[in-house]
Amino acid sequence: MTRSVALATCSQMPSGDDDSRLLDAALQADGIEASWRVWNDPDADWSRFDLVIVRSTWDYTVDRGAFIDWTRRVPRLANPTDVIAWNTDKTYLRDVSDAGIEVVPTAWIEPGRAVELPGGEFVVKPSVGASSNGAGRFDSAAAGQLDAARVHAGMLHDAGRTVMVQPYLADVDTAGETALSYFDGKFSHAVRKGAMLPQSTAYGLASGLSTSLSLPERITPRQPDAAELRLGDQVLDLIRDRFGGELLYARIDVLPTPDGPVVIELELTEPSLFLEHDAAAAGQFAAAVSNRLA
């Protein structure tokens, strides 16, 4: 019997993202019929698929509530609705920190609260946002940057967003982020992601409420070190304890610091998985999907 899956995407990318070609081929090789569907297409019949896999739904930030409502209507969804509802607001980092896992230090400023800014270089961004949309990098020592950061935070507050303020970790400019990818709770591969915010500029000020999907990323394969893998294992243990079982897919982004790596973000909803940077990755993803359909 033919097994069928839908790969959910957004209207700007109806055929999927950069992972789509390799993923389509790997699923087909495993005897799985895959088709791309726009998540908010009113004519899509999600019930006819054995599984719906969230992939490049990168416009969900325009109306997160509608997106969460959609996940609740899909009969068989990966990752599950409760995971997606938790993961699509970066306040989940509070839970990660409360579990004793190292994360980037973050101040949370809800609408209506005064905006207090740190010294040095820092980042201001919304708690709900995809890629670097809405993020700004500022330097308190540069003329006008503190005022620009307050304006940026105010714009996000006016849109009803909770603001995150984090120190800018300079090691990302040289070492980059490490993105750890997992399928069914097993480590698959990692890549290096270059810094995405220009130095001492308010990128997010002009585009804080932009619906553009992403900035160009500089991606290269990377072998993670033991400390990064241990940090990833800690996060997976938290996810298992919180939600039960393994997730079909997960990406954990970590940053270097002088005291060891810290978590910057958990991508459990619609991550780029950079399948082209590891020869076995697409096959491992397809095998994990096949196991779910067995």
Where would I find each of the regions flagged by the language model?
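Active-site nucleotide/adenylate-binding loops and adjacent lid/helix of ATP-dependent enzymes
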Residues: 2-9, 71-75, 82-175, 229-230
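Conserved N-proximal alpha/beta basic substrate-recognition cap immediately N-terminal to
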Residues: 4, 10-110
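Short secondary-structure junctions
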Residues: 32, 101-102, 118-119, 241-248
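A short, glycine/Asx- and small/polar-enriched loop/turn
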Residues: 45-50, 117-120, 174, 256-262
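A short beta-strand motif that forms the metal-chelation/ATP-contact edge
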Residues: 49-53, 125, 178-182, 260-272
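Glycine-rich phosphate/pyrophosphate-binding beta-alpha loops
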Residues: 58, 132, 196-199, 267-277
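Phosphate-binding site of ATP-dependent enzymes
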Residues: 145-242, 262
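ATP-dependent carboxylate activation and anion-phosphoryl transfer catalytic cores
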Residues: 224-294
